[in-house]
């Protein structure tokens, strides 16, 4: 299983104060020196709430690890990434809403302009991945447009797992739709969410598409996904950075790597 470390929220700390620290390149090399991280993931959002264009340029210039850039189909961002001298190892196209706290679901593959953006990256020799819900129609779209990799949105699975097996439902930011569900209901929905991820990962494998997954994964809910043999990569960020605030980035990375690289 490949471990993709999302370092967006290292930069969130910097941008909150509009200062120079924490240094994104220091985070990069801490990750590299653990010898446990396979790639670095960043999300270049339209609103630039964390990662900036300059961060992209600096990372691509010196990173010893592959860089996966998440982004929307925004024309300005597409043009910027297609113009880069140093190319990312892949671009993962994600849905984006300026009012969202974080990505809320998978990509709508009927989105106007999506096909043109995929073609633009392919024409520049940049691998494309699509951040999708685990649905067969989305996989068929990927195959039809020569997309060799997808990342399944694991938010539904992760939220259900957290509601059932942690104290998430008692916290200030508890998800209201899950608070009133019984443990039996949560278990059934969690089981179904896991089965759907497993089915679609297997479907992707038979289509010749590499299946990755990410969103909301943490030190508790990630373990079950290791039972899906056709999943090849997990992208995890917020949970690792949250733990890093308390124990340090190196230790937080190593603890996660110990879980997913058995």
Curated annotation (Swiss-Prot):
- What residues bind 3-amino-2-oxopropyl phosphate, as annotated? 6, 17, 216, 237-238
Q: Where in the cell is it found?
A: Cytoplasm
One Pfam family per UniProt: PdxJ
Q: Where is this site: Transition state stabilizer?
A: 151
Q: Where does 1-deoxy-D-xylulose 5-phosphate bind?
A: 8-9, 45, 50, 102
Q: Does the keyword Transferase apply?
A: yes
Q: Any idea which UniProt keywords this protein has?
A: Cytoplasm, Pyridoxine biosynthesis, Transferase
| Any GO MF annotation of the entry | pyridoxine 5'-phosphate synthase activity
Pathway, per record: Cofactor biosynthesis; pyridoxine 5'-phosphate biosynthesis; pyridoxine 5'-phosphate from D-erythrose 4-phosphate: step 5/5
> What cellular-component terms does GO give this entry?
cytosol
UniProt keyword annotation of Ubl conjugation present: no
- Catalyses which reaction? 3-amino-2-oxopropyl phosphate + 1-deoxy-D-xylulose 5-phosphate = pyridoxine 5'-phosphate + phosphate + 2 H2O + H(+)
Subcellular location, principal: cytoplasm
Q: Which domain of life is it from?
A: Bacteria
GO biological processes: pyridoxine biosynthetic process
What the record says about family reads: Belongs to the PNP synthase family.
According to the record's subunit comment, the protein's assembly and interactions are:
Homooctamer; tetramer of dimers.
Descriptive protein name:
Pyridoxine 5'-phosphate synthase
- What is the gene name? pdxJ
């Amino acid at each position: 299983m490949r471990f993709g470390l999302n370092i967006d929220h290292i930069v969130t700390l910097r941008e909150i104060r509009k200062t120079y620290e924490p240094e994104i390149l220091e985070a990069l090399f801490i990750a590299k020196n653990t010898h446990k991280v396979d790639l670095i993931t960043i999300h270049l959002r339209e609103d630039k709430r964390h990662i900036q264009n300059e961060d992209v340029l600096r990372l691509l210039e010196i990173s010893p690890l592959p860089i996966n850039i998440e982004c929307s189909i925004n024309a300005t961002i597409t043009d910027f990434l297609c113009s880069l001298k140093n190319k990312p190892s892949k671009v993962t196209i994600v849905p984006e809403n300026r009012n969202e706290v974080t990505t809320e679901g998978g990509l709508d593959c009927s989105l106007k302009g999506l096909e043109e953006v995929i073609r633009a990256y392919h024409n520049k020799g940049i691998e494309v991945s699509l951040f999708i819900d685990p649905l067969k129609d989305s996989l068929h779209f990927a195959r039809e447009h020569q997309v060799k990799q997808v990342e399944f949105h694991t938010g539904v699975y992760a939220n259900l797992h957290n509601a059932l097996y942690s104290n998430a439902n008692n916290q200030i930011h508890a998800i209201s739709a899950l608070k009133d569900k019984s443990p039996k209901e949560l278990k059934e929905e969690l089981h179904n969410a896991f089965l759907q991820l497993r089915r679609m990962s297997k479907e992707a494998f038979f289509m010749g598409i590499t299946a990755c997954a990410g969103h909301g994964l943490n030190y508790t809910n990630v373990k079950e996904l290791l039972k899906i043999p056709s999943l090849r990569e997990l992208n995890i960020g917020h949970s690792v950075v949250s733990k890093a605030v308390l124990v340090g980035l190196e230790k937080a990375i190593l603890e996660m790597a110990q879980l997913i690289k058995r």
